[in-house]
Structures are given as structure tokens and as C-alpha cells.
Amino acid sequence: MSTGQSDCLALVPPDESWAAAVWDYRAEFEAVGDVLAGTADLGAAANFTGWLAGLRADARPDTVRPGRVSADTFLAVRRSDRRLVGMVNIRHALNDYLFRFGGHIGYSVRPTERRKGYAKEMLRLALNKCKGLKLDRVLVTCDSKNEASVRTIRANGGALENRVPEEDGFTDRYWIEVGR
């Protein structure tokens, strides 16, 4: 990170107080035509309240929405100014799709905050959360052409298992030993 500090971010559960910041985050991605990864379908949400209700449902095994797995979504907030710089979605288990393409952790950094080391720190913080979920090994995937994500995953201990073909390219599948 540009500050040289490894503790400049906090992973914060979203609540109503973050509505404007989350919608601004979404708008920044839409303005540049970028994909909102690791946001639990924020791009498809009609409004913040509905998106937040879905997150809360997915956080509990007894209320998770059909076709999904239990997951927690966090806002990556810069401590110095409380700016939302990224989002992380941590899946507690893998279904067939997540095993092949999505992995346990998805994340994104807002376009104006990239190339500052935030993704690396976000993934490190997410891996610490995985310890609390008793996950020993975590699957993290990325588009094989996304060199920044490849570097981020490798910097956090990712070991490439394989490359899976998709319609528009390949997905690289990395395993990270988390330990407990």
C-alpha cells in the first residue's frame, strides 16, 4: 500500500449507514463498465435495502437463498478517512460453480483506488476471517489475464492448481493454505 502500513484497512459488515457509499461504489464501476466482483450481486440490486436483505439472508445457513452458499460480505474501509475502497465476499463452502470458477473469496477494488496494494491487504484480511470459519484451505480464482489478481493471490500464498476454460478465456484456480 502506498502508506506502507498493513493495517490501513478494516473489513466492516455493511449496514444502512453505508448505503450512500455502497451506491457510489457501484456507480464508479458502472461509469467505467467494469465488473463488480465480490459484491454479492450488487450490480443487479434494485436498491440498497434489498441488497442488504439478501446479504443478511445469505449469512445464515437456514436462510441462504436458493442456489447459493452461506457467505459474508464485507466493506473494505480505509481507516484514515473511512472511504470504501473495496468489497470482499467470503463463501463458507463451495457448490459446483464456486468450485470450478468462483472460489471461497471474491473481491474488488474501486477503480480510483487500484494499484495501491489494497487488494493484497483485503485478501489477507479475508484469509484471517476464513480461519474463524475453520477453513484450512481456501480456493481463490481469477481470470488468467488479470495480472493484478494473479499477483495478489500469489502474494498471499496462492498455489496454482489448474486453469479452467470458459467461454471468453480461462479461470485460474489457486489454493491457499490458511491453517487455524
Which positions does each model-derived feature cover?
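Conserved GNAT acetyl-CoA-binding A-motif
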Residues: C130-T141
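Conserved acetyl-CoA-binding loop-helix of GNAT-fold acetyltransferases
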Residues: G106-V109, R115-G132, V150-A155
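GNAT-family acyltransferases
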Residues: M1-H104, P111, K129, E167-R180
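Mobile, glycine-rich extracellular loop/lid and propeptide segments
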Residues: V88, R114, D143
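Conserved G/P- and acidic residue-centered "switch" motifs that form tight phosphate/ATP-binding loops
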Residues: R82, G117, N146
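Conserved catalytic-core motifs of GNAT/GCN5-like acyltransferases
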Residues: T141, R154, A159-R173
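Conserved beta-strand-loop-alpha-helix junction that forms the acyl-donor binding cleft
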Residues: V140-V150
